[in-house]
Structures are given as C-alpha cells and as structure tokens.
Amino acid sequence: MSRKMAKFYKLDINRTEWEIPETYQNLQPVGQGAYGQVCKAVVRGTSTKVAIKKLARPFQSAVHAKRTYRELRLLKHMDHENVIGLLDVFHPGQPADSLDQFQQVYMVTHLMDADLNNIIRTQKLSDDHVQFLVYQILRGLKYIHSAGVIHRDLKPSNIAVNEDCELRILDFGLARPAESEMTGYVATRWYRAPEIMLNWMHYNQTADIWSVGCIMAELLTGRTLFPGTDHIHQLNLIMEVLGTPADEFMSRISSESARNYIRSLPVMPRRNFRDIFRGANPLAIDLLEKMLELDADKRITAEQALAHPYMEKYHDPTDEQTAALYDQSFEENELPVEKWREMVFSEVTAFKPTAAFAELLPKEQ
C-alpha cells in the first residue's frame, strides 16, 4: 500500500501489536505460525472479507528477509482463481516512502472459509465433489507450474475452500530445496513425493502431482493414504501399495543408502488400486494410478491430468490459464539483510491492487 494518505490505527492481538489502515476493520485472529500471525478483517464500507498476515520479524536476519522477499514476489506474481494472490500490502512506517521507517510488512489476501482438512474430517464427499475439487487443484497447479514454480508442500491444510466449493492453493513455493525438510512436521511428510522426501534424485514439477494423488485418495476414502511415522515407515507404506521399484528405476536413485535399504527388503508385489479404493469411479482409480507413479519421469503432468477422462465434466482448455515465467534468479543471491529490506521496500511501495479490489478501497488512499 503506497497510498500515502492512509490513516493507521493500533490494536493488540494475542499480545502482538498490529498497526493497520482504517480501511480494514473488525480484525479477528484466525491463525499463528512461525512466520507470522493471520487475522480476518472486513474492508470498511463493504461486506468484503480478507485475510491479513503480519509477518513475524521480517528483517531479523538475511534468511528472514530473503524469505519475506520470496513470499511477496510469489504472491505478486500469481493471478488465478485457484491460487492465493496478493490483494494489498502495506507497512505502518511514516512517512510511507521512508526506507528508514520500514520495519513491518502486512500482506492482504483472499479470506477462505475452510481448508480441505476440515472438509475431509467433517463430510463424506460424492464423486462429483471429488472431481470438482481435484479439477480446481490441477487447474491452479497448471498455472503455478507454467510460471516455473514448484509448490513442494501441497497438503490438505494448504488448500483452502469456500462455501461454494471454490478452491485456492496456499503457501506455494515457499519451501526452497535447502529448507524443504521441515523436520518434525509429520503431516507434511505424508503428502511429499518420495524423490523429495528421500533426496533420491533431482525432482521436477510432478513432485506436486504425487501430492495431489495422496490428497485425492484421502478425498475418496476419508483416510490418509500413507501416514508414515518417519521416512523409513513412509517408504515402506508406499512400497506396500506400489510394490518394489524396478531395477531400471533403482539404478537412477542417487542415494546409495536408499538403494541398499530397498534391496534389503523382501520383494513386494503391487496392490490392485481397485481393492484399495473399493466402490470408487474406475476413471478416478485410473487417474490415481497415473499420479501415484514412483518414477517422476512417468508421472502425469497437471496439464495431462486436466485432460484425463475423469475430469471431462469440468475440463475446458480455453479456461485453464498459464502464467508468465516467474523470475527466480534472486534465489542465487546471498545479500546482507539491509539489501533484502531495500528490495522488499521497493516491491511494497510499487504495489498496485487489482482494479477490482482498488474499487473497494477508500478513494483518498
């Protein structure tokens, strides 16, 4: 929010001071994590609800500052119905165009009613529901992948849904390869492609498709498909379903310890997916088999999955947009915290809301 006339007010939320423009009213906390606190709010004079995230210590270190820059750049780049995007960004420092006063970053995004976790836990989904939800995930993924971005951490809690069953993918691309393990966060492992989880080999965008397969299986059955308690247990559960990998695939696993471990196990046959997903639509089972493919090079892509017969009811190639390529060259840079802060400041002050959201904002801003 580079609008210099904005009046800010302060309030205390869970022992954290928030300082936000009067544009945003009725703040209520909805979540808190290592990287920030999230509140829902109403745009003054409208019924529009938004989510506001206050980043925790955005410039505490060069690592924090680079993460802040990454999140802001990614959100700014994304403009798609099935992907969370940036509605507004602001900082309370005055004067607004002074880098010296720039210490806090607040990001405004769409407010969603629930995530897939809530939905899986509270209702039995029809096949049509599953089709529509998976279609939207794939439609959003096609867009994200076309930008050259890999999500890396797709799971039910990162997929938001509103009461009309409209879906958006959250928190994409924030886990870089170097920090992608998130030790101790069990639920992440359950949906993570084996090639990422076990550092088997170079991974590509189909790592996200594995995650969609795990999510789709859970939508169909109401149960987590591979609820591993650790990496080894996770791998065992996967092989109990998919069978022991072929020798040709094994030869491409770069981790010798992983190869030796798999070879030490009894040979496991592949289970029939029709037995695991009894009563499921045969087309759903066929798509699942193409998503839950151990070999990332043979795994179906988002674009191919959208054209699968299971998606026929919703598939419309003219309405499945692609994105401009996202410039990730900054990832190579190791810069001091002040330089990252300056770059974040430039992004914040240059931000322009979409025309639709700008219409809702007070005109003096």
From Swiss-Prot:
Domain of life of the organism encoding this protein: Eukaryota
Encoding gene (name): p38b
Family to which this protein belongs: Belongs to the protein kinase superfamily. CMGC Ser/Thr protein kinase family. MAP kinase subfamily.
Function: Kinase involved in dpp signal transduction pathway in the process of wing morphogenesis when the levels of dpp are enhanced or inhibited. May down-regulate insect immunity gene expression after prolonged infection.
Protein name: Mitogen-activated protein kinase p38b
SMART domains, per database record: S_TKc
Key words, A-Z: ATP-binding, Kinase, Nucleotide-binding, Nucleus, Phosphoprotein, Serine/threonine-protein kinase, Transferase
UniProt: ATP binding residues: 30-38, 53
